[in-house]
């Protein structure tokens, strides 16, 4: 069902589906709420789908995957000027991106054994997500782009369109990577799991015992092979270390160790990973190019800044091609 206010658009509430692992929202006290408001002006992403994010988090609340308890999503823009999603606040720490956790912050302050526990727990949470049955959860056709295309083809098509939307000048690395991704697409990309999209430590809320309290930030959600998230995960670890001239902190696994641990935890033999690391680099480079455009428009960087062409993501992507 839906809850409809006076002359308001339908508001989807958590009561619309099963109560789930977090309990029935109607029968228990809520924690302090937090709202995720869709950008109303120029933004990083070409489109947003808070209803899809609501659907995913609500469905996952019935599983062992840690997600914030969602309360409702509101599509009526008269309240806050844009659609918004309301969920319960989750206490914990978040690994920083700017400067990255590899350079300073609470992750570096942890003893090495605690850092190793954090790194392993974060990978376990992603494996747990990938192990969920998306058909049973009703999430097997979720994601951005043309729904008439199958999982991964839909995603490639979407990011090709996004690159056209983003690029204001020629970007040889992105163009070469996009061509490479289309020409080298593996034949076996039909293995569909729920892909978090922006799969990285910085999008997890970490409890004091270094367990994952919640997986957050689902703007890039889709369906696809497990390697879709794993490739992004590994590329971002490299981006936050080699890409910025820093070392991966002790306690974190090397690339090969991380792959082996993923296989051990999941029982899945990782394949075509180089392809998905290139695809991760392509997506990250497109996002950085968009960020550069937004920063120029806002006057934070000069109009002739080479940020869209020269940045850690694009540099690492060029090395992978």
Task: Place the predicted regions along the sequence by residue.
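Acidic, serine/threonine- and proline-rich low-complexity regulatory regions
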Residues: 266-275
